[in-house]
């Protein structure tokens, strides 16, 4: 989306895994954001209609050699033009370094939810953790060397309390505030938690307001965009796909579209919109890789044919090819690469059986913006957690033109589009299922026996969640088969069977997540049923890990 008609917030990426959540926060308040890497050249931004700048967090230490920094001329341009700057975590530390402050390793690293005190001259006596920072016996002593404001900093305007809960994730902290900066918040373990410069309209926070666990995070972005940057012109991010579809419509008479269809919401909604344009020149391909859930291959194909009776859809059974190539493979990234490679090979074989001109063919993908960010930030800035199946497995010599109408949208945006299309609720509310399928839910080596055990466990778990009315309250739920076995008793005999883990999480973004507290009586019923009906399992565990430090999937 070009967005010239909108007031822009420039978001500069220092490699944060939460980077896309900044964009999402801005989308939520109808602000257009332009994203660039930290090393952007001045010539590339001077002609933009920039109303403000946000500096993201990142996995580096700002004081280490080779860590990412803004170009000096770019930072000085922001100061010269007095473009408001909002630094988040690493971004705040970058501001401190650029303006002759100091950053050092934290004595106490902070991770997760933390209460932050918003500071003013009239409320510092309420601070109770003074002795955490040396010998200060009172708040007056503690803050005597810092400039405090008489009024609440405008970044925190309309926050109802002087204490707000935020998401922390840092090892370093600012230890010396640059000259002419105010100290505007502190936490129990981080004295300099937020800073503000009135002359240049610069704001820095050590925490992550973009993460949904930061209770007043969206309000901070609203204050920055509308009250500080004075943005006025709004845009509707969910209409992005309309522009993409309009751009591709000119090809509908002499081009084709092919799509890998899984039955998931992203690929299904993308196919529904694109099929409306290309009609008989649209071809959907559903590949059964042998790694799907119980009866899923047949159920998905039947669903797609009944929902889109006029759509060309081909089903390919490639299960034996996938399973034979995965034999003996235990490393999860290797599994993903093998599956990605085989998928492309099978897909290309299927396409070659269709009478179309490959040079005039688009490959439709339901890639979402979080897919791109979580897999790999530009220039390897961000630590790669996992290769995403939509963006990690595509070959460099891809023969098709790539069409990704949802690449700047988020999951809830696609759900809105699904409802606009009146697609069945089973699609709109379907939990995410990874591209590599059960390959990354069977820990270690994969074989048919393990897959069948996992299918039965997962089927009982999901169906019971639906029966008890919990499924739609949960963001994602699934079962995992561990590689280890445990000793048990069946009847009077010893058993030595697999251990299964049940996982259910609640999340708004899938970048952070909390484990879902299934009522104990329901969890007991589900567990009892699994152990009674599924052979090969004698122990069930329930995962109570949040993300971070865990990821949602095990592999």
Swiss-Prot record:
Binding site for L-glutamine: 93, 169, 172, 208
Coiled coil: none
Effect of mutating residue 413 to A: 35 percent decrease in glutaminase activity. 3.6-fold decrease in affinity for glutamine
Pathway: Purine metabolism; GMP biosynthesis; GMP from XMP (L-Gln route): step 1/1
Nucleotide-binding as UniProt keyword: yes
Reported effect, residue 160 to L: No effect on glutaminase activity. 1.2-fold decrease in affinity for ATP. 1.8-fold decrease in affinity for XMP
Protein's job: Catalyzes the conversion of xanthine monophosphate (XMP) to GMP in the presence of glutamine and ATP through an adenyl-XMP intermediate, which is the final step of de novo synthesis of GMP. The conversion of XMP to GMP involves the coordinated action of the glutamine amidotransferase (GATase) domain that catalyzes the hydrolysis of the amide side chain of glutamine producing ammonia and the ATP pyrophosphatase (ATPPase) domain that catalyzes the synthesis of adenyl-XMP intermediate from ATP.
Name of the protein this chain belongs to: GMP synthase [glutamine-hydrolyzing]
Naturally occurring in which organism (per UniProt): Plasmodium falciparum (isolate 3D7)
